[in-house]
């Protein structure tokens, strides 16, 4: 199933869910918001983005934040592809390939050069003799066709693509074009009284026009004896989301006019607060960050610092209120490609569907790529009947919604 059909599948699910609601919830979701804002708060500025990172005009629209507060948001459609740095390389070609000609891998414990030496050492590194990503001639098993990429970049990796290094290409996305994404960013951030692990599908956008994604599903990737290679900038492709970031290494368009002892800004979080590059270990000893990696300074107001890429989590949570899909006016909600099919008058609620099912947005998108509700349910570790019950619809309706899109 290509990206357009995947979006239509999710849209169909959102339509089916409309009668029973799709609100997001979390045990630590904020109960109230802090109405006051720091006088020096850095707010959204279109001028900070690199030329070409934003597609079309930024539109100011009324929006409702997830805590119920009505405000104004900037509706921003990003290019879905970095405009100031080159994507790749990802996988090494052979077991003698050097780090210069390959990307990186991070798994929550460290960042590793994907050179030939790392590939040959995987069995020892992960203490699993099943690992062998290369053939008798020393060539690395790489997903070098679109079919291989789509068969491997999913939770239920096809058997012939296990023990592969997984990489994608722009040409293999729908129409060979980047996947644009529209996000509603509060023009005046509203700090919540408590941190929230909930988020509107992705954590934010970079000043280069790239989605800041949630953590990569490392356990599933390693469980299939695959390496979903990142480039040196911490990004990679998947068929559903296109190019997106899971780690921050300092690439791209940066705003470096911060005060002394501060790192450069590289993006905005979904709640409107700026995101800066990671702090060094030495700098971390001199500051106190909250549970979401944020703090306030006299020059910048409240802002986040990204984790080191090794954490496989650019941000652990959000400290501010954000726009839930379906609560925004203007262009498509977060998670829907600009110009894509509308799910309903409230927009496509990708995170709402995922929240109802108790899975991540990544997991839901990857499961729906299969085009079959029974297969998708198996991937998600449940049954089609259980999914239907949670969504308040029938299994037949679920399958019809997906089947209709695969025949278009």
Question: Residues of each region from the PLM?
Answer:
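C-terminal motif of bacterial Sec signal peptides marking the signal peptidase cleavage site
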Residues: 16-19
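Mature extracytoplasmic/periplasmic regions of secreted or cell-envelope proteins
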Residues: 32-36, 305, 329-408
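Long, compositionally biased interface segments
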Residues: 38-52, 287-343
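Extracellular/lumenal glycan-associated surfaces
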Residues: 179-188, 206-211, 239-252, 297-312, ...
């Amino acid at each position: 199933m290509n990206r357009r059909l995947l979006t239509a599948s999710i849209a169909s699910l959102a339509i089916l869910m409309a009668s029973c609601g799709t609100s997001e919830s979390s045990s630590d979701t904020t109960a109230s918001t802090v109405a006051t804002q720091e006088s020096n708060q850095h707010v959204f500025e279109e001028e900070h983005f690199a030329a070409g990172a934003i597609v079309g005009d930024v539109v100011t629209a009324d929006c409702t934040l997830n805590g119920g507060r009505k405000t104004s948001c900037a509706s921003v459609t990003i290019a879905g592809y970095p405009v100031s740095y080159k994507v790749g390389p990802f996988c090494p070609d052979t077991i003698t390939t050097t780090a210069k000609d390959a990307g990186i891998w991070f798994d929550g414990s460290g960042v590793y050069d994907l050179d030939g030496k790392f590939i040959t050492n995987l069995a020892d590194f992960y203490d699993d003799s099943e690992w062998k990503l290369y053939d008798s001639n020393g060539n690395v098993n790489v997903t070098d066709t679109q079919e291989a990429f789509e068969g491997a970049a999913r939770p239920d990796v096809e058997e012939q693509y296990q023990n592969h290094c997984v990489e994608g290409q722009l040409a293999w996305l729908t129409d060979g074009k980047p996947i644009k994404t529209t996000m509603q960013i509060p023009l005046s951030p509203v700090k919540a009284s408590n941190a929230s692990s909930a988020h509107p599908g992705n954590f934010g956008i970079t000043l280069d026009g790239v989605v800041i994604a949630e953590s990569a599903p490392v356990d599933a990737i390693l469980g299939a004896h695959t390496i979903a290679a990142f480039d040196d900038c911490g990004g990679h492709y998947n068929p559903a989301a296109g190019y997106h970031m899971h780690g921050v290494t300092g690439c791209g368009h940066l705003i470096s006019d911060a005060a002394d002892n501060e790192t450069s800004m590289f993006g905005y979080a979904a709640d409107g607060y700026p995101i800066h590059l990671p702090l060094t270990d030495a700098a971390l000893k001199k500051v106190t960050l909250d549970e979401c990696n944020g703090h306030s300074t006299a020059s910048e107001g409240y802002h986040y610092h990204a984790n080191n890429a090794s954490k496989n989590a650019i941000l652990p949570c959000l400290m501010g209120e954000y726009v839930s899909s379906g609560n925004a006016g203007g262009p498509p909600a977060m998670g829907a490609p600009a110009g894509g099919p509308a799910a309903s008058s409230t927009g496509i609620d990708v995170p709402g569907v995922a929240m109802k099912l108790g899975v991540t947005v990544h997991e839901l998108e990857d499961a729906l790529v299969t085009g079959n509700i029974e297969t998708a349910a198996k991937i998600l570790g449940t049954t089609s009947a259980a999914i239907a019950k949670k969504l308040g619809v029938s299994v037949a309706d679920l399958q019809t919604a997906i089947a209709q899109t695969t025949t278009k």
